[in-house]
Amino acid sequence: MAEITASLVKELRERTGAGMMDCKKALTEANGDIELAIENMRKSGAIKAAKKAGNVAADGVIKTKIEGNYGYILEVNCQTDFVAKDGGFQAFADKVLDAAVAGKISDVEVLKAQFEEERVALVAKIGENINIRRIAVLEGDVLGSYQHGARIGVLVAAKGADEELVKQLAMHVAASKPEFVKPEDVSAEVVEKEYQVQLDIAMQSGKPKEIAEKMVEGRMKKFTGEVSLTGQPFVMEPSKSVGQLLKEHNADVTGFIRFEVGEGIEKVETDFAAEVAAMSKQS
């Protein structure tokens, strides 16, 4: 067995753009023959995948599944809506979710490692960067899920609720985007930040500080209600809050998770005409 030196790994990395571990693995399998390693990487799609790795994958799908007292929610990204609807991409996302459920996996890095070879092969086949972005698990007595198309997925856990109520609550979370379950769950950091913003606004109106502070107290109560599930008007019956609805059913929400495709990912806007012009100058 030939020695796989750091300089050899570095050279292969520079020539292919692939990751260090992928290069080391390819060289080991090729017994230190760099040309054979490159040929094998081309065949496996590893080089193509490495070139696509820098592309922003902000489209994709959300998948949910409930198994017993555990709910699973997964986001897998690609670059375009077209690929998000592709059968091969959808099947890959389903397979990843099934593996998470079967193994009770809540660590996305474990899933990434498990499916890296399949991901690389799919990138080579489809021609877009693909990323297993995140996985979350929710435990509860009664679980419900809702999917708004493939782009928004919600899990809700509750006590004392039936499946229909939990499904309606999941639909509400999808539409109203609460950040917390109850107003008292809003973190001190979030409250303080909003308080300072509202106080600055009130002070700019020329009111004395004492009056401005009283105004802000009322606004803060409204704010914590707006960002919490139980404080929001129920989307299917806005005359009552979600908190009132739960009280009527003698039920309680213990947690929820809401995923939306691409949230938090900065999408690069491309000027197609400029891109074509740039490519023509290079050729």
From Swiss-Prot:
Q: Cytoplasm among the record's keywords?
A: yes
Keywords linked to the UniProt accession: Cytoplasm, Elongation factor, Protein biosynthesis
Cited CDD domains: UBA_EF-Ts
Q: Which cysteines are joined by disulfide bonds?
A: none
Region (Involved in Mg(2+) ion dislocation from EF-Tu) residue spans: 80-83
What does the function comment of this entry state?
A: Associates with the EF-Tu.GDP complex and induces the exchange of GDP to GTP. It remains bound to the aminoacyl-tRNA.EF-Tu.GTP complex up to the GTP hydrolysis stage on the ribosome.
Q: Report what the protein is called.
A: Elongation factor Ts
**Originating organism:** Klebsiella pneumoniae subsp. pneumoniae (strain ATCC 700721 / MGH 78578)
